[in-house]
Amino acid sequence: MRKVIGIGETILDIIFRNNRPHTAVPGGSTFNGLISLGRLGVPVSFISEVGNDHVGDIIRDFMKENNLSTRYVDRFPDGKSPISLAFLDNDSNADYTFYKDYPKQRLDVPLPEINEDDIFIYGSYYSLNPALRERMVEFLDYARQRKAILYYDPNFRKAHAHEAIHLAPTLLENFEYADIIRGSDEDFLNIFGEADSEKVYTDHIRFYCDRFITTHGAGGVNLYH
């Protein structure tokens, strides 16, 4: 059976309503998608890192409960598992504050088993982070050599929009690795200053990857190929 392998950050989200803690749940861009697949019974592995602490235990237990393999999760002894505080307004929109304390050596995990036509998912700032880039490229090269389908979701948020020009070479390299690129109109507005999906595809994506999916909230989905 085809497997899905993802790489990215997982973080414990502590959610506040009316300035009071309401609940705490692990989250993350790639992580959330893999959790949904695990609940459906799809064979899923997640490459990530958490601290050797109580928060790390919570995250790993949550993964196991939702059928995600923890074999490729690095438990670093130095530093602490990342957390975020999510303050919800009356419309349930969140304002985030992040707390991270990673060690110098990161993602100290073996290469996962990948077979032809397995799906390898990568994205968000985690795939662009200079501190992780060399290791990220190792995984991308390996997935491509193993003939996996590489699926890239930039998940490029407004908080990083001011870095778009600086990160452009790495973004384009991620485009080159991808067999499928999927993102929201907001992602590409933050990257290119352009939300028109056809122009984004024609001017920025098609040269690197000809399979392109954009989402528009209530406005639906566009597919280009």
Task: Describe each PLM feature range.
Residues M1-S69:
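Glycine-rich phosphate/adenosyl-contacting loop at the front of the ribokinase-like
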Residues K3-I5, D118-I119, I180, R211:
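Structural motif
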Residues P43-S124:
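Conserved N-terminal subdomain of the carbohydrate kinase-like
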Residues D101, Y125, N155-A159, E186, ...:
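Active-site beta-loop-alpha junctions enriched in small/polar residues
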Residues K147-P154:
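Short beta-strand/loop segments at the ligand-binding rim of alpha/beta enzyme cores
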